[in-house]
């Protein structure tokens, strides 16, 4: 029963049901000159905002608004962006060099915004995520009294209703409602397709044992795994996989090596990005700007970890890498698609999520080259899907 309920929550419903399913706090119920943000706050505008501070989700902002929307941006959180989303930062600054000249207002890592700087820029609105809003409640109240609006978005929770609501808000604010609606419609359709197909499978074809790990710590140290409520763990839950970390008390934490080996995963997923940290030399790299050769070399190190040869996943060559950096966007429905193809290759053979995400960029952000590696199987056992 629980899995069925969660499956509905994650994978979405038909368009008619969605309007009833989204809670009021998460709906983008738009009226003329107003949006209802992700905390249920109605924010009214006398005119369309022309000066915008984007304190988070710049990629989503551009995906929905298009490249011209950058002309309205007066500041970004430049601190830490390059170090934790290197590929994204490189491609966006190449495509839109004016980003480099935008002032930084902080808040990328610690969520603390420089409200004095924001106030000096005279924006019409500040776009923040939920954590930033809560950390800066008093500071943002000062901005509100000065006439600067605050709108809260959320792509972090990985909830379809929040993804869609946030995207519709951006469409409303940027005069791109048609683009936003098309993006939300494709997102909902793609996830509902997964739901329908998996629901029709017999139980014996489900519940494959899976270990997922964030590969930012490198080969020598196990990185975070995820319980059933968050990020990759939530995706596995909704795809009816048996995530070995599903019952972990913390939303995310490293598992003990002995526990992983004893659990004998049938599939191993290593989530990669480009991180600038102490483990940079052998951390898993995936995503924008990453080449297949580089990703394969790094994935080979994870597949060759001591004692992991005892697992079914390594013995059968079911070791994969997925792109961690592209989660938390309106295009991230491709990652449930990728993993569905891994878990149920015959059922989802017709899907091509790699082409799907590239087409998304071509349609909505053609200035950005989406070349990179999004999902990859260890080279000794097969090619990418």
Residues covered by each model-derived region:
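A short, structured surface patch at a secondary-structure boundary
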Residues: 54-55, 60-120, 125-132, 139
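Bacterial Sec-exported substrate-binding components of ABC uptake systems
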Residues: 2-7, 14, 18-62, 178-213, ...
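Extracytoplasmic ligand-binding site segments that recognize negatively charged/polar headgroups
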Residues: 81-87, 109, 132-138, 153-166, ...
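Structural recognition of the beta-strand scaffold that forms the well-ordered cores
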Residues: 53-55, 74-77, 125-129, 150-153, ...
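Structured C-terminal subdomain patch of bacterial secreted/periplasmic proteins
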Residues: 29, 106, 158-174, 181, ...
